[in-house]
A protein has these predicted regions:
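Amphipathic alpha-helical dimerization/coiled-coil segments
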Residues: 19, 105-116
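A short, conserved structural fragment
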Residues: 75-85
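Short acidic, hydrophobic short linear motifs in intrinsically disordered regions
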Residues: 46-58
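Short, cationic-aromatic polyanion-contact patches
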Residues: 85-108
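Short helix-to-turn junction characteristic of helix-turn-helix DNA-binding domains
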Residues: 40-44
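Phosphate-/nucleic-acid-contacting segments
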Residues: 53, 60-64, 88-92
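Short amphipathic alpha-helical interaction segments
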Residues: 61-76
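Short alpha-helical segments that sit at the start of domains
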Residues: 8-39
Length: 116
């Protein structure tokens, strides 16, 4: 087995070990969960505000009620939180928690270190 294949298998084995103790399990439940994570983290990394309504609209092939359920669950699990601005108290922005940012950055670092 070549090194790249071995590294990739070890990576996924480690991800499976973490799956019930981290956000891995939650964001891999469905493509919608994973897409939400990517949208929120992309907005965070680009220093952009992403409103809950924008997120619901951008989630591919996910109904608005289902999107709302996923968002609420992510907030309950402290992966994300909602923030209001002083300009418009009706508009809520979704932001990643510090703990999730750290976990996501570790995930990216591990992915970058895989040799292909």
């Amino acid at each position: 087995m070549n090194k790249a294949t071995k590294d990739l298998l070890e990576f996924w084995e480690e991800q499976m070990r973490l799956s019930h103790t981290s956000s891995n399990y939650f964001f891999r439940k469905s493509p919608s969960h994973y897409h939400m994570m990517l949208l929120v983290m992309s907005a965070y990394k680009l220093n952009q505000n992403l409103s809950v309504e924008e997120l619901k609209t951008r989630l591919f092939k996910t109904s608005r009620p289902k999107s709302a359920l996923i968002i609420n669950e992510a907030c309950e699990k402290c992966f994300f939180f909602l923030e209001k601005t002083s300009k418009d108290q009706r508009k809520k922005y979704i932001k990643p928690s510090e703990a999730f940012i750290k976990e996501f950055n570790e995930y990216l670092k591990t992915l970058k270190n895989l040799s292909f």
